[in-house]
C-alpha cells in the first residue's frame, strides 16, 4: 500500500509547477516597463497582472542591453530597479555566492535598504517594513488613513518562491464608508 502511495505521489509530481513570487500590483516598476514597451525598447506583456519578479528581471536585462535607447532618467530608473531585482538576476544567470549573506537593518547585496535579508546558494529571505500615512478631507470632514505591516519574499533553490504581504489599515474620520 505504501509503495502504491509513493508511486502515485511521484507520478502526480510531474504535473506540479514551481511556486512563483509575484511583484505586487502597486509597484512603480510596472509603469517603468510599460513606458519602455511603448517606446519599443522591450516587449512587455502585462495584460495579466501581477507578473513574476523573474519575468520583470528578464525585462530589465533586455532594457539594459538597449541602454543607448534610454534617456538619462530612464537609465537612473533602470539602475534603481536593477538593485531591487539583484537576487532574480543572480537566479537567472545562475550566479553562486561563496558564503551566506546576512543583513539586519541595512543595505543588502543589491544595495537595497531592508529590515532583514538572508541569502545563500539554496535559500533567500527578504523582509521589509510597510509604513504609511495619508490625510485628506471628504465633504469638508477630515479623513486619515494609517497603515503598517511587513512584506517578505524569497526563494528556496530556484524552483520554489514564496511571498507574504501583511498590512494593518486604520481609517479615522466621520466620512468613512464602514460598509466597504
Q: Which positions does each model-derived feature cover?
A:
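Outer-membrane beta-barrel and related beta-rich outer-membrane complex signature
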Residues: 174-178
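Boundary at the C-terminal end of the N-terminal hydrophobic targeting segment
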Residues: 16-20
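Sec-dependent N-terminal signal peptides
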Residues: 5-15
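N-terminal secretory signal peptides that target proteins for export/translocation
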Residues: 1-3
